Swiss-Prot record:
This is NAD kinase. The keyword Nucleotide-binding applies. It catalyses: NAD(+) + ATP = ADP + NADP(+) + H(+). GO terms for molecular function: ATP binding; metal ion binding; NAD binding; NAD+ kinase activity. Belongs to the NAD kinase family. It comes from Clostridium tetani (strain Massachusetts / E88). The gene is nadK. NAD(+) binds at D61, G62, K66, N134, D135, K145, D164, T175, A176, Y177, S178, L179, S180. GO terms for cellular component: cytoplasm. Involved in the regulation of the intracellular balance of NAD and NADP, and is a key enzyme in the biosynthesis of NADP. Catalyzes specifically the phosphorylation on 2'-hydroxyl of the adenosine moiety of NAD to yield NADP. Transmembrane segments: none annotated. It holds the Pfam family NAD_kinase_C. It is found in: Cytoplasm.
Length: 274
């Protein structure tokens, strides 16, 4: 018996028509199969997820980002089928799903691993860990006030920063918030972390690309800080000042189909209007 998961963004496949067609395509290509359906990533956090050989994600990059933090933990690969705008992470378009499902079951694919980022902090005496595929963002909680941060890299003092916040992105996340804040584009499979200030008050402070083994410590001088992981606000953290950011021990595994893999540079050109 093969166990296949489907995670659908119900805001994009509102009536479930694509979901139904994909279930039918799976059953047409594999007779001894059980399909588990998840809506908006609910349930992916459960331990039974580790029994799935793959999760087909119906949605966009945001849907994959949300699912990845659960699936990476259980070492389950993702096959992304895009609904809506062109994305960096989805592998194929919804109009081509029959070909994609057929190729998967024929074994015509390979798995591309993407580094993830981890943030460790302590909140109310409890150690907390968060994992993201794109980025970890530390921003000020007090609107209108200047925030100051002390930045350390591998135990060495790097700089004292006055800014609206700090982004630590993976190579995958370099084309997201980090790019908007002036960071560089990094090829997504490179093992790297990128530290980018948000609206730094000095033009001398720029992004820095680091080895993926680097340990970044952010110490906030503000009492109220907002921690955001892959665009999802974790909490309004009162009296939390220290954040330790490293590469995550988990990897996001993306399925790339033979004969269908999209050229990264064409996606980059279309997304960024180059």
């Amino acid at each position: 018996m093969r166990y296949i998961g489907i995670n659908v963004n119900t805001g994009k496949d509102v009536e479930g028509r694509l979901l139904k067609k994909i279930v039918e395509a799976i059953e047409d290509n594999c007779k001894d199969v059980e399909v588990k359906i998840y809506k908006d990533s609910i349930g992916l956090e459960k331990k039974e997820t580790e029994n799935l050989e793959v999760v087909i994600v119906l949605g966009g990059d945001g849907t994959i980002l949300k699912a990845s933090k659960y699936l990476a933990k259980y070492n389950v690969p993702i096959l992304g089928i895009n609904i809506g705008n062109l994305g960096f992470l989805t592998e194929t378009e919804s109009s081509n799903f029959i070909f994609s499902i057929r190729n998967y079951f024929k074994g015509k694919y390979y798995i591309e691993e993407r580094n993830m980022v981890q943030c460790t902090t302590e909140y109310k005496g409890i150690k907390k860990e968060f994992h993201g595929l794109n980025d970890i963002v530390v921003t000020k909680g007090d609107v209108g006030k200047t925030a100051k941060y002390d930045l350390y890299i591998d135990g060495n003092f790097y700089t004292k920063l006055s800014s609206d916040g700090v982004i630590v992105s993976t190579s995958t996340g370099s084309t997201a918030y980090s790019l908007s804040a002036g960071g560089p584009i990094i090829y997504p499979t490179l093992d790297a972390l990128c530290l980018t200030p948000i609206c730094g008050h000095s033009l001398r402070i720029r992004s820095i690309v680091l080895n993926h083994k680097s340990i970044i410590k952010i110490i906030s001088q503000s009492e109220n800080v907002i921690l955001t992981v892959d665009g999802e606000e974790i909490n309004f953290l009162e009296n939390v000042k220290e954040f330790l950011i490293t590469s995550s021990p988990y990897k996001c595994k993306l399925i790339k189909l033979e004969g269908e893999h999209r050229d990264y540079y064409s996606i980059l050109r279309n997304k960024l209007y180059l």
